Amino acid sequence: MESLNALLQGMGLMHLGAGQAIMLLVSLLLLWLAIAKKFEPLLLLPIGFGGLLSNIPEAGMALTALESLLAHHDAGQLAVIAAKLNCAPDVHAIKEALALALPSVQNQMENLAVDMGYTPGVLALFYKVAIGSGVAPLVIFMGVGAMTDFGPLLANPRTLLLGAAAQFGIFATVLGALTLNYFGLIAFTLPQAAAIGIIGGADGPTAIYLSGKLAPELLGAIAVAAYSYMALVPLIQPPIMRALTSEKERKIRMVQLRTVSKREKILFPVVLLLLVALLLPDAAPLLGMFCFGNLMRESGVVERLSDTVQNGLINIVTIFLGLSVGAKLVADKFLQPQTLGILLLGVIAFGIGTAAGVLMAKLLNLCSKNKINPLIGSAGVSAVPMAARVSNKVGLESDAQNFLLMHAMGPNVAGVIGSAIAAGVMLKYVLAM
């Protein structure tokens, strides 16, 4: 009987909590959205599978060595950790003390747990290497740069303003999160509000990079919200675009884009990086990788490197990035009131960014002979190239011969630049406080 009892107690099913069961269902939902509905499958599939692995009871695949120690509830070991942190020797008190401790102290406690015989789970290791270091989002940004054509933006520089206007959704959402906190509805700190706000940029790697720096405890919810809403751009944007434009405005035909020279395309990423990085060094990591990837593409002298970055490298990193985000889909981190706030603020951020881009296009038309179709303003959110395709689709509904795709790629690419700069602004001023 003892052997049978030990066997039963060793089964993960016997230790399955309500929170873990809910998160397993959430992870299955993400897999269904990725496979059946094709919602951002490149990220949602590994994120969903990472969520499954993270919530298997007793497996500990997403736990660090210290978290494994705390889950083991050994009184003697807890007493040693508590003595180092000057707190009560119980799990709750130790977690609170760790949350307030300096990173150096947290690392010291992690090393102490390793010395006691605990090892981090494989997903925790993935997270430390891929996101904790900030490497994975930066490599993906390099790949995105290698796949980006700045031609439409250079051919019509005014569209840079549309991309900039769309970033208004980011800062409006930061204010929204702080407002929720002010009225006591949902508690958000300033770093958490900044990390949530970047969802409005519709740029997954930037959202992961910034939340990993400012609010790693919210990374899972922020990443899921960012990629889910990016997939829902064809549903979120059109009603806003139609509401803010007249039939006449939607029929505006834009002049043919000029041909952009090879020299312009080579110089642009270098000049862009120097201008922005010298003024805002905190934006240099994201924008630097983006511009480097684009320079490899446009220079034409490193085609092998450019091809590797666009295909093999970005695919490999995407796998580990998704699994690493899935490591944060654990019940005690995800099933919080803050998650609902993140999902609500995320969709509001998309809406405000879309509206701001459209309204900026209408404003530019007041002082310009060459009219801009306001529909391309919505492409200022950096969901590349989906937002540009949505602008083209809505335009074709009003005029079947009015093709806006290439025009919309200008603000779409500008949105990528804008979201990277916005992330740099957040890092500079939030971390300085």
Swiss-Prot record:
Class in the EC hierarchy, top level: translocase
A GO molecular function for this record?
decarboxylation-driven active transmembrane transporter activity
Write the record's keywords in alphabetical order, separated by commas. Cell membrane, Ion transport, Membrane, Sodium, Sodium transport, Translocase, Transmembrane, Transmembrane helix, Transport
Q: Name one Pfam family in it.
A: OAD_beta
Report TM segments.
13-35, 42-64, 125-147, 160-182, 214-236, 266-288, 308-327, 339-361, 413-432
Name the catalysed reactions.
oxaloacetate + 2 Na(+)(in) + H(+) = pyruvate + 2 Na(+)(out) + CO2
One Gene Ontology BP term is: sodium ion transport
* Keyword check for Nucleotide-binding: no
Cofactor(s) required, per the database record = Na(+)
Coarsely, its chief localization is membrane
Q: EC number(s) in its UniProt entry? A: 7.2.4.2
Q: Provide the Gene Ontology terms for cellular component.
A: plasma membrane
**Subcellular location per the Swiss-Prot or TrEMBL entry:** Cell membrane
Q: Look up the domain of life of the source.
A: Bacteria
How does this polypeptide assemble, per the annotation?
Heterotrimer of an alpha, a beta and a gamma subunit.
Quote the function comment for this protein.
Catalyzes the decarboxylation of oxaloacetate coupled to Na(+) translocation.
The record's similarity note reads: Belongs to the GcdB/MmdB/OadB family.
Name under which the protein is recorded: Oxaloacetate decarboxylase beta chain 1
Q: What is the lineage of its organism?
A: Bacteria, Pseudomonadati, Pseudomonadota, Gammaproteobacteria, Enterobacterales
Recorded name of the encoding gene: oadB1
